[in-house]
Amino acid sequence: MQRRNKDLTDVYLIIAKNIKKYRRKNNMTQLDLAKKSGYSYAYIRRVEGPSCIKNFSIQTIYNLSKVLNVSIKQLFDESDI
């Protein structure tokens, strides 16, 4: 079970890094992403933060992918992060 939790944490970290990467590629600040997505600035900070426990939903990933103009698949991509 412990290994499974680590694997899940790794997936969340990959997604978080990709959200940050694509946000920056779109020349957006965390505040810009918050405003365009409807999430709070604090929530976006938590999503992107490397040290917090991740628990955002597939719906959140979908919504952020639409704002960032990328596919959900791109947010799960481990290469180039």
Set out the residue ranges of the language-model regions.
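Short alpha-helical DNA-recognition segment
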Residues: 27-47
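Residues within the helices of the helix-turn-helix
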Residues: 20, 31, 62
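Short C-terminal boundary/hinge segments that cap the last helix of small helical domains
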Residues: 69-81
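Short, basic-rich loop-to-helix N-cap that marks the start of a DNA-contacting helix
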Residues: 51-66
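Residue-level signal for the short linker/turn that defines the boundary of a DNA-recognition helix
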Residues: 17, 27-28, 56-59
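The alpha-helix within a helix-turn-helix
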Residues: 23, 34, 65
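A short, Lys/Arg-rich alpha-helix, primarily the initiator
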Residues: 2-25
